[in-house]
Amino acid sequence: MSGLLFLLLLNYNNYQCHIPKNLIIMRKYLLLSFVFALISFLSSCQKEESVAEYIPFRSEKDGKWGFINLDGDVLLEDEFKREPTIVSNDRFFAKNKAGYWEMYTADKNARQVGKDYVQAGAFIEDVAPVVEKGKAIDFIDKNGKVRFTLGNVDGVAITSCRNFTDGLAIFKCGGYYGAIDASGNVVIKPDYLALESAKDGKFIGVHNKYKGVKDRSKVKITVLDTSGKVLSEFPLAKISDGVDYFCDDVLAVAKEGTDGNNYWGLINEKGEWILHVSHKIRSIKGMRNGKFIFSDGEQCGLMDFNGEVLIRPKYSNIKFTGANQLFVLDDHIDPQWKLITEEEDVISPNEFDEVYPLPGDKYFVKDDGDSWIIIDDKGKEVKTKVDIYEFSYNQGDTEFESQYLDFTSFINELHIKKDGLLGLNLTMKVADVIKSFSFLDKQYGEGDFSDNASSYRCSNDISVDLNFNNVKFQIAALFDDNVADYTFSSGFSNISPNQISVTFYNEKLLKGHLSQLTRSLKAKLKKVGTIVKETEYALIVASGNAYYFVGSDGDKVYLNYGNFDVNAINLNMFTGIDDAVTTTSDSYADDADYVDSVCLDSAVAY
C-alpha cells in the first residue's frame, strides 16, 4: 500500500511547471496517513504491545458505548452516545453533541479533564496531540496541560502532524516532512518530500534534494532510525511499487515483472536483496519472527525469510495473532476461521465467522449470531458479564491540522514579487498557465479544472479553485483575447495574460480573519511597489511594469497583479464590511456582477 506514496511522488517529480518551491505539497497525505495507521495496526511486525488499556464497545446495535478490556472486565457500560477512543494512559476522548472532543479520566466517574478540542488523538505516548478551535496543534499531558505547541521550524509554520509511531510524530512544514519526539524536539528535520514510519524503529523518506528529478534511477530512498540518523540510502529504481514496513531489519518490497505484474521480495535497510522477488509471491500480508504471510495471487501461505515455504498457499486468508499463532480462513462452501499453530496444529476445534486479532494473547472473534466474544491463545472463551455487539480500536484523529494561520508565513508562500506572484507572471503563455494551474489542481484542487483546449472556446480567462493548507482561494489569469484557437487546430493561443488574480474566501482558516489578511497583504505590497492610492481596506501600488491591487469587501479579499486602469477603480467601494449577499467560491455569477459594480473594469479577475 505504501508504494502508492512513492508512485505519487514520482508523478509529482516528473511534472515540471512554474510553481513556487514552498507551495508544492502532497495532498494525499491524509489518505496515506490512514493507510499507514491501518497497516501499523492490522499487519505490523507484531512486536509491539497494544497501548489500549480498555476498548470501546456497545451491547446493542443502537446502544451507547462503554469500555471493556481483554480480560472481560467492564469499566463503563452504556455511557456515551458517540464512539469514544480507546483508553490509554488512563485517559480517553469522546465527542460531545457539538462535535468537540472531550478528555475523560478512565474510571467509574469518567471526569472531564482539559478543554474542548476540534481534534484529538489517543495517548500513544505520555502526551497526546489536540487542536483547539482557532489555535495551533498542542500536545497535552493526561491532566490537560499543554506540554508543547507546534509553531514553526526556522520561521516556517508547521501546518499538520500525525500521532506517534515508534516514538516519533511526523509533521509537515512548508511542504516538507520531518518528525518530532514526545518532548517536541525536532528529531528529523523537515527536509523530506515524503516521510513514513516503516515500523521496527525505522522511517523511510525521499529527501527534497530529489525534487524535480525526472530520472527515477537517480532518486534514492532514505532509511532513518528514531534518532534521525540516516542509516542508508538505496535506489528507488530498485523497486517498482509496494514499499511496506520493516520487520527484523527486513523490508518487504515489490518489483514489476516482465508481464507487468508486481512480485514481492525482501531487502535489508541497505537495499540488498535478502529474498529476491519470486513469481510465487504476489503480495506480502504480514511479517513476524523471520516469517511472512504471502499470497500467490489466489491463496495464502506462510514462508520464512530464506524462501522456504512453511505452509503452502491453501487458505483464503491468514492473519498473525499476537501469540505466535495464526488465524486461517478455510476455502470451503461456508468459509470459517480457525486458530492454528505455525505447524498447522489446530488449537481449538471451534471455528469463527469473523476474527480480529490484537497485540497480545487474546482476540475478538465472532461465532454464530451478532455478538463478539473474547478468546485466549488456547481458544477458550474469556467470560464477560456483557454482550459485545460492536467494539472499536478508535484512536481518535490520525491527521491533525493547525487552525492557526501564521499570516507572515502564508504570505511569504504566495511569493509576491515585483513582476508577479505564485510563480506566475505576465509574460507566460497560455500553455504555461495551463500547466501551472493543472499541477496546482492536482495538489489542492477543489473543483473541476480542465487542461483541454476545447474547454476554453470563446473564453478569455483561466481559473482554478484551491484549498491550500486549509485556506480556500481561487487563482485566475485573464487575457485580452480567446485563450484557445476557435478551430482547435493549434490548441491554445500564443498569448500572455494581462492580469493575474487571487480571491480569498471567508472560509476555513480565513473565516473571520479577512481584515488581518488585508492588512498583511497591504504591508507586503508596500515593500514591492510604490503606493498609488490607499484606503483602510484597499491599496494600489505600482510594481514592475504593472500594478498590484488588494481590497476587501468583508466577504472576500481580492489580490490582483496586471494592467488595469487604476483611475477607474473606486477604492471606497471596498469597505471591509459584508453588505452584499454572501457568496462562496461556488457562486461565480454573483462574484462577476459584484466586480463589475466596483469598476475594476472588464479586465479585472476576481
Regions found by a protein language model. Give the residues of each.
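Non-cytosolic coordination micro-motifs
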Residues: D377, Y389, Q395-D465, K472-Y606
